[in-house]
Amino acid sequence: MKREFIETPSFTKKWFSLGFNDEDLAELEQFLVENPEAGDMMVGTGGLRKLRFAFKGKGKSGSARVCYVDFAAFEKDYLIQVFS
């Protein structure tokens, strides 16, 4: 299954300011392709999910919370926000 990932400008800015790189982003995207309903649905948001994602080789302190929306019918994921 091919998915398109769309990042908000604030997601991209914060992603790199947290020290993550393009390889980490590819790892996150692959995880979401394999697990499109991962994370907890945030009540009252219409589908926004919050996911704790630990990156390989970075340990527990290298994890982040990612807020995203999956539109399965359109094969699109919107990466909304990231924080640690």
Residue ranges of each PLM-predicted region?
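Short, surface-exposed coil-to-beta transition loops
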Residues: 61-66
